[in-house]
């Protein structure tokens, strides 16, 4: 049955747009194939939008889907596609699919023990690639093809050259396929790892693993699953299926710890079945042989605070992206100094062995958690030095604010599996989330300062770091957050408060009496806070910085309050929403407990445009978002003292219904006339507002001085300039709000801010920059 509409945009945008009627019964039968050949753009409740692009067709070809199957699918399910009046459109779409899919999988990278080969399916493809100057320069001498029979191939200079060749081949229109036949590989030892009998994978997790590994072969690529859907278990299932030494890259130290714990929870890691390591029968001298390591002893973790030794018995290595870059730089530095980094630490210059040196030993499998981080310039250069035959990336946010997300096609591989939040939520695997934008007016003093700073801008940009911080520090936001937290604490909710500015994060900690978790929080203290939050009622609210965006496993959390964010980053929005997507315990009437996601926005500020960009992304993913206004000066609402005994249902359901009714109103008011906070924080106090404003402006001025001092004036010595800056910074710390206002008012009349600073693009100042990764090593 037909349920698709097609729009041809090949000449304008280089794609074919497909609109799907999601309400049709036949749509469920074709959604899997449609997601394979086209990239999902918008998934509303009734209509979905997909785009057939060069990359999606390449992914389809790598999944062994032919051009004829794609055309037959369009003939069967697109309205009017075979009508004579649309014959020209059909020919254009068929030619588009034929042109790209016919070139896919014509070449692949093959890695054996000592060589890196580029293998082609025919001699014509091999000769075409060798004509390119870049590809030819990366080949060993001689550059002629070897074995001009069924599979001609030629040698590459190094493993790192394979990444450059892969990128170049994509530009030439010959995307490479990387396939690893792990069952036939004898150059890398097998590991004895298997899922425990009590582990019960979900159907979509099994489908994701089968999409990557089947029939003894592993296809390199990316698996996209929503936050909270069990990506870590998918990675563990791949470990158990491939059964080869594996390197796992994580976002940070907490993520490494969580991966290690879940591997030990869901899988059994044992010594080789034939007991090659430590079998007494293998000893001919009668000496006592050490027993082979099992379990956690076969897992090594390398982070900034934990550096386990990587031995011959190590089956799994867990490390961070930052540690990978550090090891890569150390290896390059040692090579420049004139000796190679051997595993035993011996070279022409004797030195102590470093555990990081063995990160680049041969692996059968490389798993990259949060793979959307890999296209960053700081990381992708190090990827080429990892000697792994199969690569799989895991992510919940296959999106970046720049165009680098496309680089994953040649860095890792095509998208292998993708499933929407809506499908998992309807099946009960994820929680139903209520997304609410709360519009909060700026406090009077902050509003005047915001208008004054806005008028001083000399470039046509929409904001500066100071404007963003003024909007985030809005005291009325504090009142709003207090009100939201108060209502949910009364329902025994677990609440996460996100704020990107550390100074403001500490203010919210004082305001709510909640612990802070940021980059400076010690690892042990962080784990204790998360443990108390997860399993006790001692901690119900935690204030988090950007370190909580990824790899924080808190299934009990069901409320997120977002005070400030990283510009319009859609990735960050989805990741923070993912903290509460895990399914919650049901009430006694069988209904699931709701999850709540609040974004508190200062009206008439730059936050409005950023929030619109992020919310549009959530709507495209199928979430329902509503808007309410917070009135800090409105008449207080009557407090709810108890539960209506006449209402049907249990206490939890009634309270959830009352919360939904409260936030469906167009205006949210304080439940008490003058809410009081713990400690010295009182957002209604004019004295507190003045001090907070002073600190915000002074903090920005220090950042301004640091930014402008990087370019010294001509003729001024570095040490002199540094001394002047130190004096200015010391003076800025001692200034009051009146001093700062006087200085800026006088400066605005005589001179304008430095042109080079003002001409910085908005993307670099306050926009979302996905090359900046906020986590600890």
Swiss-Prot record:
Tree of life domain: Eukaryota
Keyword terms of this UniProt record: ATP-binding, DNA damage, DNA repair, Helicase, Hydrolase, Isomerase, Nucleotide-binding
EC number per UniProt: 5.6.2.4
GO molecular function: 3'-5' DNA helicase activity; ATP binding; ATP hydrolysis activity; damaged DNA binding
SUPFAM superfamilies documented for this protein: P-loop containing nucleoside triphosphate hydrolases
Any one cellular-component term (Gene Ontology): transcription factor TFIIH holo complex
All copies of domain Helicase ATP-binding, residue ranges: 212-416
Catalytic activity: Couples ATP hydrolysis with the unwinding of duplex DNA by translocating in the 3'-5' direction; ATP + H2O = ADP + phosphate + H(+)
Entries under Gene3D superfamilies matching the protein: P-loop containing nucleotide triphosphate hydrolases
All residue ranges annotated as the Helicase C-terminal domain in the record: 484-631
Alphabetized InterPro entries for the sequence: ATP-dep_DNA_Helicase, ERCC3_RAD25_C, Helicase/UvrB_N, Helicase_ATP-bd, Helicase_C-like, P-loop_NTPase, XPB/Ssl2_N
Extent of motif DEVH box: 369-372
Residues the record lists as binding ATP: 225-232
Pfam families: ERCC3_RAD25_C, Helicase_C_3, ResIII
Disruption phenotype annotation: Mutants are much less tolerant than wild-type cells to UV light- and cisplatin-induced DNA damage.
Gene Ontology biological process: DNA repair; DNA-templated transcription; transcription initiation at RNA polymerase II promoter
Reported function: ATP-dependent 3'-5' DNA helicase/translocase; binds dsDNA rather than ssDNA, unzipping it in a translocase rather than classical helicase activity. Involved in nucleotide excision repair (NER) of damaged DNA. XPB-R is a paralog of XBP, but is not a component of the TFIIH basal transcription factor and is dispensable for RNA polymerase II transcription.
Family the UniProt entry places it in: Belongs to the helicase family. RAD25/XPB subfamily.
PANTHER family: GENERAL TRANSCRIPTION AND DNA REPAIR FACTOR IIH HELICASE SUBUNIT XPB (PTHR11274:SF0), RAD25/XP-B DNA REPAIR HELICASE (PTHR11274)
Protein name: DNA repair helicase/translocase XPB-R
Biological classification of the source: Eukaryota, Discoba, Euglenozoa, Kinetoplastea, Metakinetoplastina
The gene coding this protein: XPB-R
């Amino acid at each position: 049955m037909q349920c698709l509409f097609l729009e041809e945009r090949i000449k304008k945008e280089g794609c074919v747009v497909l609109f799907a009627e999601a309400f049709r019964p036949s749509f469920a039968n074709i959604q899997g194939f449609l997601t394979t050949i086209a990239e999902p753009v918008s998934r509303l409740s009734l209509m979905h939008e997909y785009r057939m692009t060069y990359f999606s067709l390449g992914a389809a070809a790598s999944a062994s889907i032919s051009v004829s199957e794609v055309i037959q699918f369009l003939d069967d399910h697109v309205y009017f596609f075979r009508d004579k009046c649309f014959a020209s459109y059909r020919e254009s779409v068929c030619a588009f699919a034929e042109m790209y899919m016919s070139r896919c999988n014509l070449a692949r990278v093959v890695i054996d023990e000592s060589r890196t080969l580029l293998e082609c399916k025919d001699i014509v493809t091999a000769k075409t690639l060798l004509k390119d100057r870049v590809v030819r320069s990366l080949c060993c001498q001689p550059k002629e093809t070897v074995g001009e029979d069924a599979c001609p191939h030629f040698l590459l200079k190094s493993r790192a050259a394979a990444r450059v060749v892969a990128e170049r081949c994509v530009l030439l229109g010959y995307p490479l396929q990387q396939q690893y036949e792990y069952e036939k590989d004898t150059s890398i030892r097998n590991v004895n790892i298997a899922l425990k009998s009590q582990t019960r994978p979900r159907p979509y997790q099994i489908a994701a693993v089968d999409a990557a590994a089947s029939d003894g072969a592993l296809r390199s690529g990316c698996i996209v699953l929503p936050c909270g859907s069990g990506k870590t278990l998918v990675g563990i299932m791949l470990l158990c299926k491939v059964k080869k030494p594996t390197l796992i890259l994580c976002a940070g130290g907490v993520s490494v710890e969580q991966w290690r714990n879940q591997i030990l929870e869901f899988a059994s890691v044992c010594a080789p079945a034939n007991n090659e390591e430590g079998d007494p029968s293998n000893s001919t001298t009668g000496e006592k042989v050490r027993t082979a390591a099992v379990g956690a002893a076969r897992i090594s973790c390398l982070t900034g605070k934990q550096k386990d030794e990587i031995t011959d018995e190590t089956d799994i290595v867990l490390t961070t992206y930052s540690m990978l870059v550090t090891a890569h730089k150390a290896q390059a530095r040692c090579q420049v100094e004139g000796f190679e980094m051997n595993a035993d630490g011996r070279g022409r210059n004797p030195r102590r062995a470093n555990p990081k040196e063995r990160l680049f030993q041969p692996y059968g499998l490389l798993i990259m958690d949060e793979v959307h981080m890999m296209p960053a310039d700081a990381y992708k250069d190090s990827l080429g030095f990892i000697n792994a035959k199969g690569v799989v990336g895991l992510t919940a946010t296959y999106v970046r604010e720049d165009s680098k997300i496309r680089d994953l096609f040649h860095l890792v591989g095509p998208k292998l599996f993708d499933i929407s939040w809506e499908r998992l939520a309807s099946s009960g695997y994820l929680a139903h989330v209520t997304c609410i934008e709360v519009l909060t007016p700026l406090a009077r003093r902050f509003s005047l300062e915001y208008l004054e700073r806005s008028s001083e801008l000399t470039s046509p940009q929409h904001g500066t770091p100071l404007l963003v911080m003024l909007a985030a520090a809005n005291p009325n936001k504090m009142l709003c957050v207090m009100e939201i937290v108060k209502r949910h604490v009364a329902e025994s909710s677990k609440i996460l408060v996100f704020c990107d500015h550390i100074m403001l994060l500490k203010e919210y900690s004082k305001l709510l009496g909640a612990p802070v978790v940021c980059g400076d929080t010690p690892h042990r203290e962080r784990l204790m806070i998360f443990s108390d939050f997860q399993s006790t009622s001692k901690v119900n609210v935690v204030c988090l910085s950007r370190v909580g965006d990824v790899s924080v496993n808190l299934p009990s959390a069901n409320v997120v309050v977002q005070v400030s964010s990283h510009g319009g980053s859609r990735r960050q929005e989805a990741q923070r929403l993912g903290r509460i997507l895990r399914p919650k315990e049901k009430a006694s009437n069988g209904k699931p407990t709701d999850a709540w996601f609040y974004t508190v926005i200062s009206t008439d500020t730059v936050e409005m445009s950023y929030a619109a960009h992020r919310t549009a992304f959530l709507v495209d993913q199928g979430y329902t978002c509503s808007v309410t206004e917070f009135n800090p000066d409105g008449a207080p609402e009557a407090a709810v003292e108890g539960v209506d005994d006449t209402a049907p249902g249990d206490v939890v359901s009634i309270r959830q219904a009352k919360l939904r009714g409260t936030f469906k109103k167009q205006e949210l008011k304080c439940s008490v006339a003058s809410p009081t906070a713990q400690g010295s924080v009182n957002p209604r106090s004019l004295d507190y507002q003045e001090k907070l404003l002073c600190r915000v402006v002074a903090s920005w001025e220090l950042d301004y001085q640091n930014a402008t001092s990087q370019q010294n004036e001509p003729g001024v010595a570095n040490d002199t300039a540094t001394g002047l800056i130190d004096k200015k910074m010391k003076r800025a710390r001692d200034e009051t709000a009146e001093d700062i206002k006087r200085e800026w008012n006088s400066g605005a009349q005589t001179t304008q801010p430095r042109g080079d600073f003002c001409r910085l693009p908005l993307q670099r100042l306050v926009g979302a920059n996905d090359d900046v990764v906020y986590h600890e090593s």
